[in-house]
From Swiss-Prot:
The keyword tRNA-binding does not apply. This is Transcription initiation factor TFIID subunit 2. Keywords: Nucleus, Transcription, Transcription regulation. One of its GO terms (cellular component) is transcription factor TFIID complex. The TFIID basal transcription factor complex plays a major role in the initiation of RNA polymerase II (Pol II)-dependent transcription. TFIID recognizes and binds promoters with or without a TATA box via its subunit tbp, a TATA-box-binding protein, and promotes assembly of the pre-initiation complex (PIC). The TFIID complex consists of tbp and TBP-associated factors (TAFs). Transmembrane segments: none annotated. It comes from Danio rerio (Zebrafish). Belongs to the TAF2 family. Residues 1177-1191 have a biased composition (Polar residues). Component of the TFIID basal transcription factor complex, composed of TATA-box-binding protein tbp, and a number of TBP-associated factors (TAFs). It is found in: Nucleus. GO terms for biological process: transcription initiation at RNA polymerase II promoter. Its main location: nucleus. Residues 1163-1172 have a biased composition (Basic and acidic residues).
Length: 1191
């Protein structure tokens, strides 16, 4: 591992956490609240440790004790409200900088936190080094908005009968939302977890269940869990509910939990989990690292699967019975991913956010190996191609994904991804889409490393990481071995070079340290004289999201004499490559042609070019570069490639290329593939849609029955009566998927009038009519849903005559038949719901298409009723998608408002996230176009949503930022009025200064600044503000401490700082109290000010601003609360502090002087207001003082 010898991991904290107790002694489902305490055992690493910073969000802190002494504390969370509510700023550049600064200010990886505890002086003033400190914190959570999710169904019965349950969730490190901790992946410790719950409930958590103790009255019981393996707080979780319990019949240390009445589904779903265990243990040659494993299936899950130490929480919707085909591979995949993350992600953690790619890469890579073993090589290669296409499309459209972001300084200027509208410095500022692509790229890069060093070495590296971690986990903390359980990029690379002896530096530099993919264009000519293939490969490396590739590239050429691999060197400026051919063109001899896999086949060579021996050419067939290839070869070459190349990726590429060649030979090649049983089913499904496109292009010359009809009839219909389908038999999954897909593809066929041919429609209606599933051992719900999708695909726009009113009577006869079928299906669903309500989902989509094509009146009412809380989640998402589409097409502000209300109030986090994602993908308007929907109220509402409305869910906040960006871009939204100009009269120098924040030009490289009216109005500086916009509401530079301010009349946030009106007794505090060592209490504020000041640095070159203007110029464009007697009275303490600080910073460089001075002025003012937090301990002054639990 790459670390300084014997130093271990360099911690950003002045102490080492060794053990933590979490005790939740009350879970109240009625009130949705929990009460408990934590106790952290820490070893100071400095003499005189006088302050401890921890992470805690939304917890109400009652008391803090350090070694049984009451300890004062300050709670400050700048992420609650990123920019103050008074701020007039509305541009995203500004928000992103402020948000990054706020997240950094409480980032545990930088040693920061929301909770700052002052160690009682009697503990550190003794002078000797403290051996150990125990920090005890009592806290409660009331109706948490993040971190813990309560599901309490609104039905009859007690909580257990209602299947009420609660579970922890979060995006990345989010444990601080439900208990105070060091919320960092690099701070490991051992754990003791206790949960007291009603006797009818079960509590599941990490580690081993040591004992379960009933209370005296037998009404409650306490579950005691011990986790002896050092684990990071973000990997700790809990779930409490009336779970049914299944001990895995194959592995007794594995236990599964599900909600009441789902046990039969659980048994079936989990019946093959042991195979996944065996597979991973075998390839890693390493035992599963924990002594037990628990799977918990919950409703309203945040994501499909989340992994924690020795347990995973899954969505209950992944459970299925043996009748279901389509869900099975999906659920298996999620289980395999969860188990891979147990090894890499939970057991082995990361040193810093920049090393996240290693863990995500390894777990994704070994999951891919499982996929290959279980579902076969074709499925695996198809998956790699899909993932590669996804990342290529994302990077070319949005911009590069950077796996290993390095930040040299604290300055935002060295932004490695200027093309993104969010910072990648923290996991909590990333868009969800970007993070998914990040994970996708990480495992693809691991595969590139495997190509370079071989799979054998790759698995040896993983084994080495695991065995080192395994040894370390059993050590006592004093041995400083625990850092071996953390992986870093450099440690991983060192391990690779030690094991394989190969230098993969260039590969890492290309794919990990920089972003972008490669874009190749290829074409060729055959030189008959020299018998040489002249290949030209060009690159586009100037477009967004691309990079230049220099290095080897493999080209495979299939000739008459066989298949030949060539490795070409892509140099700086070489485009043309000469490749010698092995075969002379000899078409007269009848001889079998050898393929790549050793097979020899007869081919009909009549289509090929008489002068050339080339059958087809492939660039980078192994996908060993992250690239997009656009290759030009003749249509007959693509047809040969489709028919005879055995690699599924090559077949997919050929199908895609043949869409551009709508000719009878293309039609024959595609039909042959459809009829080939040996061909991979996904390739055949893809060929169906390609054939439909080709048929539509050839509509005037097409002969015979509609495409695919005769094939379907031959495969699935009765011999005696070809229009009646056989009773369903889905024993062969290959033909099942084909049977589902062909009707959907056929429905895309169009005749000369661009309508779906009558023959096709009656064919689909007959399939629905004669569908018979009585003798089938599998459910046909997915098949019937696809038949409804086929009806939807057959719809074409209605021809309306002089805007007649649409009624059911005036419906076209065909459309009427479709509408009747959909209505019948929907009514049947109410009586006999299908698995996952697949039928309802398809019906809702069909109804929206009927509306969009003008057959029935456009109306969102039906969709809104299906989108209500209480319906199955898939149905809600389908209905919401329809409402979002309606909003865009009809420009409906009331529906947009309804959607945004759901985002703020819906109980299900996943649904809120999906609404914002779908709105960003299908926006009601974009920044390019004018729209009546774009108005000041909407800007304010979205700003409020991302500024403070989503502070308890990182993912949702980033979704809101995404939507804001989609609608308004980075700069000030165009629909906002320009702020009026303000004049500042400087009475000292007797001149007027134009408000310096109103600038005509923007400095390149700095975010745009909006002319927000920020003035400093203090008596000392003698400024008069003449500003029509803010007459009388001059703003005082209070610090971001106001973040925690609560609107008048609303209840305070739990644990939030309350501002008191400072009175004389505070300003005349004793000198001793003022000296309490809190000089960095507000480094979080200082940090943010530092960032914002850099943004808003005055642009007047040359002259150093005069001391008076200085205050105005360096004013950050942050929110400023109105001037009150508070800000004037806090002037008193300012002089004393100000000089003290100024002296401290004299050594700073001259040019930064005014900034620092300004910063400290704010800081000291705050400090003055805050230092009295400690006047009477423990939590008096600023924090909410509640009677302690033990009182």
């Amino acid at each position: 591992m790459n670390r300084k010898k014997d130093k271990g991991f360099e911690s950003p904290r002045p102490y080492k956490l060794t053990h933590q107790v979490v005790c939740i002694n009350n879970v109240n489902f009625q009130r949705k609240s929990v009460i408990g305490y934590v106790e952290l055992t820490i070893f100071p690493t400095v003499v005189n440790l006088n302050r401890i910073k921890l992470n805690s969000k939304q917890c109400r802190i009652y008391r803090v004790r350090v070694n049984d002494l009451e300890a004062p504390f300050i709670y400050n969370d700048p992420t609650l409200e990123v920019c103050h509510h008074e701020s007039k700023q509305r541009n995203l550049n500004y928000f992103s900088s402020a948000y990054t600064a706020a997240v950094s200010a409480v980032d545990p990886d930088a040693g920061n936190g929301e909770l700052s505890i002052k160690v009682p002086s009697e503990l550190w003033k003794q002078g000797d080094e403290m051996k150990v400190m125990k920090v005890y914190i009592e806290f409660s959570l009331d109706q948490p908005k993040g971190g813990l999710h309560f599901v309490v169904p609104d039905v009859e019965g007690n909580m257990a009968e209602r299947a009420a349950h609660v579970f922890s969730f979060g995006n990345q490190n989010s444990s601080r939302f439900w208990f105070p901790c060091v919320d960092s992946y690099s701070e490991l410790c051992t754990w003791k977890l206790e949960f007291t719950v009603d006797a009818s409930m079960v509590a599941v958590s990490c580690g081993d269940l040591v004992e379960t103790v009933y209370t005296h009255d037998m009404r409650k019981k306490t579950y005691h869990y011990m986790l002896p393996i050092p684990t990071a707080a973000p990997n700790i979780s809990m779930a409490v509910g009336p779970f049914e319990i299944l001990v895995d019949p194959y592995m007794h240390e594995v236990t599964h939990f599900c909600l009441p009445q789902l046990l039969p589904l659980l048994k079936h779903t989990m019946s093959y989990l042991h195979e996944i265990f065996e597979f991973y243990e075998e390839i890693l040659t390493c035992r599963y690292p924990y002594s037990c494993f628990k799977t918990v299936f919950v409703d309203e899950a945040y994501v499909q699967v989340s992994s924690y130490a020795s347990m995973s929480i899954f969505s209950t919707n992944l459970l299925h019975s043996g009748l279901i085909i389509d869900q099975t591979p999906m659920t298996r995949s999620f289980l395999a991913q969860a188990l891979a993350q147990q090894f890499f992600g939970c057991f082995i953690s990361r040193m810093s956010w920049a090393d996240e790619w290693v863990l995500k890469g390894i777990s994704g890579y070994i999951y891919g190996l499982y996929l290959k073993k279980t579902f076969g090589v074709n499925e695996y290669r198809h998956w790699i191609k899909e993932e590669l296409d996804k990342i290529v499309e994302y990077e070319l459209k949005i911009g590069g994904v950077l796996l290993h972001p390095t930040f040299s300084g604290g300055k935002e200027k060295d932004n490695p991804t200027p093309h993104l509208h969010f910072s990648i410095k923290h996991p909590h500022t990333l868009s969800w889409e970007y993070y998914k692509m990040f994970q996708c790229k990480a495992h693809l890069v691991m595969r590139l490393i495997e190509n370079r060093i071989s799979m054998e070495f790759m698995l040896q590296v993983f084994n080495k990481l695991l065995s080192l971690a395994s040894t370390a986990s059993s050590q006592k903390y004093q041995s400083h071995m625990w850092s071996q359980m953390l992986v870093s990029t450099s440690g991983f690379l060192k391990s690779i070079s030690n094991v394989s002896g190969k230098d993969i530096g260039p590969l890492i530099k290309q794919w990990v340290d920089q972003s972008g993919v490669v874009k190749f264009f290829g074409s060729f000519a055959f030189n008959r004289k020299r018998n040489v293939l002249e290949l030209e490969i060009r690159q586009d490396y100037t477009s967004s999201g691309t990079q230049k590739y220099v290095g080897p590239i493999k080209v495979t050429v299939q000739e008459l004499d066989g298949s030949f691999n060539h490795t070409l060197q892509i140099e700086e400026n070489s485009l043309k490559h000469d490749i010698p051919c092995h075969s002379k063109s000899r078409r007269n001899k009848k001889k079998k042609i050898p393929l790549m896999n050793g097979e020899e086949v007869d081919m009909d060579l009549s289509a090929m070019d008489a002068d050339s021996p080339l059958l087809w050419i492939r660039i980078d067939p192994d996908m060993s570069i992250l690239r997009k290839v656009e290759f030009e070869q003749a249509d007959f070459m693509w047809q040969y490639q489709l028919r005879y190349e055995r690699d599924v990726v090559a077949q997919e590429e050929a199908i895609l290329a043949l869409e551009k060649f709508p000719t009878p030979p293309s039609r024959r090649a595609l039909t042959d593939i459809l009829e080939q049983d040996q061909c991979f089913y996904k390739v055949r499904m893809h060929a169906c849609f390609c054939l439909a496109k080709i048929a539509n292009s050839m509509v005037s010359t097409w002969t015979g029955p509609p495409a695919m009809k005769s094939l379907f009839t031959r495969m699935f219909c009765c011999k005696s009566c070809p229009n009646i389908v056989k009773t369903n038999n889905f024993i062969s999954f290959q033909s099942y998927f084909l049977q589902k897909t062909i009707p959907v593809a056929m429905a895309q066929l169009r005749d000369v009038q661009n309508l779906c041919p009558r023959e096709v429609l009656s064919f689909i209606l007959d399939l629905i009519k004669y569908n018979d599933n009585r003798k089938n051992k599998f459910s046909d719900n997915y098949y019937r849903a696809e038949l409804i999708d086929a009806l939807t695909n057959s719809l074409t726009p209605a021809i309306s005559i002089n805007n007649e009113v649409r009624t059911v009577d005036s419906l076209n006869a065909d459309v009427r038949l479709i509408l009747e079928e959909i209505t019948r299906f929907l009514n049947m669903e109410k009586l006999l719901p299908s698995y996952r309500n697949t039928i309802t989902v398809s019906c809702l989509r069909a109804i929206r298409m009927l509306q969009k094509n003008g057959h029935i009146p456009s109306d969102p009412t039906l969709f809104k009723s299906y989108a209500e809380y209480g319906h199955f989640v898939d149905v809600r998402i389908a209905a919401l998608e329809a409402v979002i589409d309606y909003t865009r097409v009809d420009r409906s502000s009331s529906e947009l408002q309804w959607l945004l209300d759901l985002v703020q109030n819906d109980p299900v986090h996943y649904v809120r996230h999906e609404i914002l994602s779908m709105l960003a993908k299908n926006p009601p308007f974009t920044k390019a176009a004018d729209s009546s929907l774009c108005n000041e109220a909407l800007v304010d509402q979205l700003w409020k949503l991302m500024n403070s409305g989503t502070c308890h869910d990182w993912r949702l906040r980033c979704d809101a930022v995404n939507l804001y960006y989609t609608l308004f871009g980075l700069t000030r939204p165009s629909c906002l009025p320009l702020p009026e100009l303000g004049l500042v009269l400087n009475l000292k120098e007797k001149k007027a200064v134009l408000n310096p924040t109103i600038k005509s030009e923007q400095i390149p490289g700095l975010p745009e600044m909006t002319p927000s009216m920020t003035f400093i109005n203090t008596l000392k500086e003698e400024h008069v503000v003449m500003d029509p916009a803010l007459s009388g509401v001059a703003m005082a530079p209070l610090s971001l401490k106001r973040k925690a301010e609560t609107p008048v009349g609303s209840a305070p946030e739990p644990g939030q700082v309350l501002q008191e009106e400072p009175s004389a007794k505070i300003t005349l505090k004793s000198r001793e109290e003022e000296d309490i060592d809190m000089d960095t209490v507000h480094d979080s504020q200082a940090f943010i000010y530092h960032h914002l000041n850099m943004l808003e640095r005055p642009s007047t070159p040359g002259k150093e601003p005069s001391s008076v203007e200085q205050a105005i110029l360096s004013m950050p464009g942050t929110p400023m609360p109105t001037l009150s007697k508070e800000s004037t009275s806090s002037k008193h303490g300012e002089h004393h502090h100000h000089h003290h600080h100024h002296h401290e910073h004299k050594k700073k460089k001259k040019k930064h002087k005014h900034k620092h001075k300004h910063k400290h002025k704010h800081e000291s003012k705050d400090k003055d207001r805050d230092s009295h937090a400690f006047v009477n301990s423990p939590a008096s002054g600023l924090s909410i003082r509640s009677p302690s639990l033990s009182d």
